[in-house]
Amino acid sequence: MQHLPRDWTATTPKKDYGQDLNLEICEEGQYRGLDLIVQLKSSATGDILNNRERHPLKVSTYNYLWDNLRVVLIVKYIEDENEAYWTLLKDVEPPANPEQENFTIYFPRQNKLSEINWNDIINYVRQVTDKKLASTRAKNKQNHS
């Protein structure tokens, strides 16, 4: 939470279905309907392969998050480094076998949460939101024509 922009609102869902935090984005003191889901992971030590941190994820959690219409940020905190790494769900390689229970996801080691450019995240959330709204508005326009 210490790395979040000051004005953002973080809420914890009452039931954990794969959403650990919901973040509402504040820009220039205004909330404009932009939000994202955060899935939190952690470990005592790192698990590095090819300069990427890795962590198991349940396929059911991946599917739940993938079917969600909001942007998903996955964060892994490593206790002995006192550092967290992040990736967007869109950048996670889907499970090779959808029938398996777990699969491995990777976090680029350069994606340190302490160094994240939140403007890049805001811009991506805005792109996704604008596409969804444009699609909905186009469908509504067709239905009312």
Describe the function of each predicted region.
Residues 1-17, 23-145:
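Mixed-charge (Asp/Glu-Lys/Arg
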